[in-house]
Design a protein with these regions (language model features):
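N-terminal lobe of the biotin/lipoate ligase/transferase fold
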Residues: 1-106, 128
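Long, positively charged amphipathic alpha-helical accessory segments at protein N-termini or as interdomain linkers
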Residues: 2-9, 18, 86-88, 94-112, ...
Length: 261
């Protein structure tokens, strides 16, 4: 396998409490999140870490694709069964974003930040995308399984022209992939176990790249201008529109406005 990744090495870097987690490695796959869904559909309800060297159909938020060239990034999915209330979904997304940002910061010489909801940026370049999905039990009102997909642009590469804001975490291929994978997985596992931590949203606000910024957001197919004011305790983005009215966004696409007229 050209990946030359070791499941044993990754496992050895994880906390002892997660030493028995299943770890599946692929040289290339369509999508680690899609593989996670296939495993769940087959009845494999166990905590699992899926890692691929490349993806042929990587998935991002809102149905977008995620550029996933072989050997230039880390494409991983954690499958967990936390049995959480459905309304915790957005808070899970925020917790994972904070965890990934904290995990990747030691590998970057520049400060990292979170662009709401859960893209990780270095300066003005996106270096990591996160896609959280859930398998729910509506009768019991709980999330049975959570699928956490994390795509990291690890090493320097040429990106397609239609990805002008894409960037990379590291300039040189000198860091251990296993160390990055294990560090990210460890932080995410800790964050899900500590979801009620009152410091969570405080940390998210500190990492946010949007607060106080003029923004343009798309919601229900309509684009509007506003200012990002705050993040609420559930991870919603509090904004103020041009008429001075305040709203809370729980989903949608947001960008910083260059034209502030």
């Amino acid at each position: 396998m050209s990946l030359q990744l070791s499941a044993d090495k990754i496992r050895g870097l994880l906390p002892q409490a997660w030493a028995d987690i299943d770890i599946d490695l692929y040289e290339e796959i369509d999508s680690t999140n899609m593989q996670a869904r296939r495993d769940l559909q087959a009845g494999l309800y166990r905590p699992k870490l899926i890692v691929a060297g490349g993806q042929t159909a990587g998935r991002g938020r809102r149905g977008k694709s995620f550029y996933s060239p072989k050997e230039k990034g880390i494409y991983m999915t954690l499958v967990l069964q936390p049995t959480l209330p459905l309304q915790q979904g957005l808070r899970i997304t925020a917790a994972v974003a904070v965890a990934v940002c904290e995990a990747l910061q030691p590998f970057s010489q520049e400060k990292l930040g979170i662009k709401w909801v859960n893209d990780i940026y270095k300066a003005d370049k996106k270096i990591c995308g996160i896609l959280t999905e859930g398998i729910s039990d509506f009768e019991q009102g709980v999330l049975k399984s959570v699928i956490i997909g994390i795509g990291i642009n690890l090493f320097s590469q040429e990106f397609p022209e239609d990805l002008p804001v894409a960037g990379t975490l590291c300039a040189a291929e000198t860091i251990s992939r296993e160390e990055v994978i294990a560090t990210v997985a460890k932080k995410v596992l800790e964050s899900i176990a500590d979801l009620e931590n009152p410091q969570l949203m405080h940390k998210y606000r500190e990492y946010s790249t949007l607060l106080g910024q003029p923004i343009r957001y798309e919601y229900n197919g309509v684009t509007r201008d506003a200012v990002a004011l705050d993040i609420d305790e559930d991870g919603g983005l509090i904004i103020q529109d041009r008429d001075g009215n305040r709203h809370i966004l729980n989903s949608g696409e947001v960008t910083v406005r260059k034209d502030t007229r």
